[in-house]
Amino acid sequence: MGQKVNPIGLRVGINRTWDSRWFADETYAKLLHQDLKLRKYLREKLAQAGVSRVVIERPAKKARITIHTARPGVVIGKKGADIEVLRKELSKMTGSEVHLNIVEIRKPELDAQLVAESIAQQLERRVAFRRAMKRAVQSAMRLGAQGIRINCSGRLGGAEIARMEWYREGRVPLHTLRADVDYGVGTAHTTYGSCGVKVWVFKGEILAHDPMAQDKRAAGETAPAGR
């Protein structure tokens, strides 16, 4: 089962926390749609900023949005001008006061979502898929990952028949629930069709069964860089 299921969903409540943290009664569906809309908007608006995660909290009719990004300078802008414009746009979309936090990802090479998007962008630029995969694996292992696996599927290199290629280094224990396995997905839209990229990064084991363990570990790697 661990081979098939999304590794993040399987570990929620064990060593991962939810990306949407709020409680609602009859407005649940409306707020859920709003979350999806906000995430889609932020990913499109901040496509060049390397956004990995968007955490949404809703305390007392407000919204607190935390953006995990590899390039906080792109989000914040000159003298904080861009972040203020972004905050106003999000307030208009939610109809409530929005607090924005920007968290810098110090090691983007170890973030599965950013690695997947990077490989997808390289495939769109016609970089050889084996070279892109190998480079990503070497960078992750050099920066301290205990294991990484990358799957690329589709008409790789413009081949007539679609296929799936994978590359792995180290160990990626998908069945071990205490294992801190990060997972990311990207799609490359090439002239031959779409190619899917999946990335699993194993960063070590979290022994304490603490729902905040993921955030505690992330706090050591990342540093806040915004308001």
Swiss-Prot record:
The KH type-2 domain, residue ranges: 38-106
Gene Ontology terms: biological process: translation
Residue ranges crossing the lipid bilayer per the database entry: none
GO CC aspect terms: cytosolic small ribosomal subunit
Pfam families reported in the protein's UniProt record: KH_2, Ribosomal_S3_C
Origin: domain of life: Bacteria
GO molecular function, one term: rRNA binding
Keywords assigned: Ribonucleoprotein, Ribosomal protein, RNA-binding, rRNA-binding
Subunit structure: Part of the 30S ribosomal subunit. Forms a tight complex with proteins S10 and S14.
Family note: Belongs to the universal ribosomal protein uS3 family.
Job of this protein: Binds the lower part of the 30S subunit head. Binds mRNA in the 70S ribosome, positioning it for translation.
HAMAP family: Ribosomal_uS3_B
Record-given protein name: Small ribosomal subunit protein uS3
